[in-house]
Amino acid sequence: MSNLTPIATYNLALQPFQPVPAIEDDFPISIRITLASLDPEAADDKAEPSSLRILKKSNSLLSDDYFEDDDDDEEEDDEEDELDDEEEEEEAEEEKSSKKSNGKKSSKKDEDEEEDDEEEDDEDNDEDDVSEYIVCTLSPKHQYQQTLDLTITPDEEVYFVVTGSYPIHLTGNYIEHPADQDEEDYDNEDEDYDDEYDLSPDEDEIIYGAPLDDEYDDEEESEEEGTPKIEEIVEEKEKVKESPKESKKRVAEESTSKKSKKAKKDEKKSVQFSKELEQGPTGSTLVEKDNKKATPTKDKKETPVKDDGDKKKKFPTKTLLGGVITEDRKIGSGATAKSGAKVGIRYIGKLKNGKVFDKNTSGKPFSFKLGKGECIKGFDLGVTGMAVGGERRVIIPPKMGYGSQALPGIPANSELTFDIKLVSLK
């Protein structure tokens, strides 16, 4: 996803003289405001035009992390400041001693003047902490709306306030912004995900139709079957006198025994759920393995080559806003799903312990519009960017799912995992 890509709609209603934060603490996502509209119903009888104002701290963008790399420079500056402070204190003591010699009255006046200066400095500092800016002024007699282009990140402490008689409504989008997360955070979250999240065999059977252990066993057995082929070449050279009829019989017996072994393995791998799930998520690794079995060997003398990459196939993963993790199992074709598009999907929803709490694998696909708030935030983010025919695993943390709300089959603060297949896009 590119920078500043819209991911959901943003709306905020402002009543006169009631400051409201631009970004809520429980949903720290960057926003882009594009329109300010006036509510024609006045909140009082004065009918005064309403002005939209921004209240922000001038130093809000400078977080503690900004200074971590400059610790050494700060220590040097602190030492210089301490020396300057000591010199100033010495000068002040000398001045006080000279003033005492001139009389007690003059010293009292100086102390009063210093206290007044300190109070004025404190007032100036308080005023400098918060800055106020007028964005636009709207009136039902002259102008109802004003187009804007304001981008605000969670690091900024920004409040909106309306002065006047009419409420103002703001419209825009939640966007993906580089300031929301660093690349180092993505890498750390990916490492934690690889270490902590482990699929149980039952879940793999639901998705792929066979446990992962069976796949590795099949590859090991195929390697073991490949070893006798090399030994057969040596034996054929040594046993030249063997009749062609006997050799044909032996080859036929070996082929029938191999077919019976494969039939038994296929029976073990068959899962009832995979038969019912005709349009649901499929396992690409299982399809590739079946294609390898169906391809006959043209020459027995060819030495089988081991491919370590096929044993442990890694799927591309991404960490999105709010900690949502996506893993593309199969890339679709055609246009990709964006905010405002209507999508139709098949899905299987599971808890972290592997328990299935919801699914749509047959009948009418589940349809909704992206970015319109028709589903949980993590689901909106997870489906965005998919193409028709694509399959994706989406892992949603509690804050991007149902949070502390408990639902039937879903405990509070649950991490949700969805295996999704996009079947339609409009």
Swiss-Prot record:
Pfam families reported for this sequence: FKBP_C, NPL
Compositional bias annotation for Acidic residues: 65-94, 111-131, 181-225
Membrane spanning residue stretches: none
Regulation: Inhibited by both FK506 and rapamycin.
Ranges where the record places region Disordered: 37-143, 171-314
Principal location: nucleus
PROSITE patterns named among the record's database cross-references: FKBP_PPIASE
Assigned GO CC terms: chromatin; nucleolus
Domain of life: Eukaryota
UniProt catalytic activity: [protein]-peptidylproline (omega=180) = [protein]-peptidylproline (omega=0)
Keyword Coiled coil: no
InterPro entries, per the entry: NPL, PPIase_dom_sf, PPIase_FKBP_dom, PPIase_Fpr3/Fpr4-like
EC number(s) stated in the UniProt entry for this protein: 5.2.1.8
Biased composition (Basic and acidic residues): 226-257, 264-278, 287-311
Alphabetic keyword roster: Isomerase, Nucleus, Rotamase
Keyword Isomerase: yes
Single GO molecular function: peptidyl-prolyl cis-trans isomerase activity
Subcellular location: Nucleus, Nucleolus
Domain PPIase FKBP-type: 340-426
Function as written in the Swiss-Prot or TrEMBL entry: PPIases accelerate the folding of proteins. It catalyzes the cis-trans isomerization of proline imidic peptide bonds in oligopeptides.
Protein family: Belongs to the FKBP-type PPIase family. FKBP3/4 subfamily.
Protein name as it appears in the record: FK506-binding protein 3
Organism: Candida albicans (strain SC5314 / ATCC MYA-2876) (Yeast)
Top-level taxonomy: Eukaryota, Fungi, Dikarya, Ascomycota, Saccharomycotina
